[in-house]
Amino acid sequence: MTPETGLIKGPDRKQRCWWGADSEDYRAYHDDEWGQPVADDQRLFEKICLEGFQAGLSWLTILRKRENFRRAFRNFDFHKVARFAQRDVDRLLQDAGIVRHRGKIESTINNAKRARELEKEFGSLAAYFWQFEPPKGERPAHLDRAALSSLAKTPTSIALSKDLKKRGWSFVGPTTAYAFMQAMGLVNDHLEGCHARRRIATARGAFSPPSKA
């Protein structure tokens, strides 16, 4: 890895963000998902929930359990998860395929109820979340590893976190909110020189952010 740029060359000889070359799982996630602009409500809900489950853990741990989470939480259909009852909490606490943390499980159910309220108000979760695409002035002029390391949270992620908490969401601190923004394409945080950066920039350029219904 080049320390200044944060780039590393994978077994396929492609330059990637340093974290995206650690394992085959990470490479696929980095190359095919991370930073692609997303407007699908279930995927948005899934991601913000999984970011909450990640708190205190590595993303690779969550990524390797993602299919188990999808099975356990009805593919993160928030209309279905919002109807979960205590028996579902008890069931999930016995599920070794997921992170068995009562607070995070109960938070996911609570957030599903709050997601339904957002859908009613904005027409979709996508319309709500894409309001928080940050202004260009908040973005670094050149994105190397040092610049990326300074972006654990930003004014926009702080604003998103505050607004979600005001609306009753939990496990949505500003660092979690920024990781969500990175993954769902509200920002392009592939480093300069990463083979995926230009492709993500093109996808973002062609993307029309949903608006409030």
Predicted regions and their residues:
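HhH-family (HhH-GPD) DNA N-glycosylase catalytic core used in base-excision repair
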Residues: 1-213
